[in-house]
Regions:
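Non-catalytic signal-transmission and effector/linker regions of two-component phosphorelay proteins
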Residues: 1-23, 29-36, 125-138
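Acidic catalytic/metal-coordinating carboxylates
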Residues: 50-51, 77-80
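Receiver (REC) domain active-site loop signature in two-component systems and cognate sites
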Residues: 73
Length: 138
């Protein structure tokens, strides 16, 4: 199981009550690291998983308000993870990320209830704004 936990709250970001937890599922370690750092710099706690199955096992016993989810992973696609989320935890907000421009996949996941869809590399400010908006809706 690949799990990275980032628990520091930055003092510049007191508006996030008790440091919101953002879950991140991506099979690329460098992407997990960079997005974890970005979210951490904005005051979020990050729980990052390299394997979708490990995330699904974790969420079976832990509430998840928001997950940032890679759409194309080797063992299970983000769309398959979304199907599990819709069945188990329909209130969970999902932001999809991908390294490949795929408008059909974007349309599919947005229609299925995703909060946002970003193609890597993405604008950090827009991404953080989407994270905050998704958490406000959760």
């Amino acid at each position: 199981m690949s799990l990275t936990t980032v628990t520091e709250l930055t003092p510049e970001c007191p508006s996030i009550a008790s440091a919101e937890v953002c879950y991140l599922v991506d099979d690329d370690p460098s992407v997990r690291k960079s997005i974890s750092r970005l979210l951490e710099s904005e005051g979020f706690n990050v729980r990052a998983f390299g394997e979708p199955e490990a995330f699904l096992n974790h969420m079976a016993t832990n509430p998840v308000r928001l997950v940032v989810l890679d759409i194309w992973m080797e063992r299970m696609t983000g769309m398959e993870v979304l199907a599990h989320l819709c069945a188990r935890s329909p209130e969970t907000r999902v932001i999809f990320i991908t390294g490949h421009e795929d408008r059909a996949a974007e349309a599919t996941v947005m229609q299925a209830g995703a909060s946002a869809f970003f193609i890597k590399p993405f604008d950090n400010e827009k991404f953080i704004a989407a994270v905050r908006e998704a958490l406000n809706q959760a």
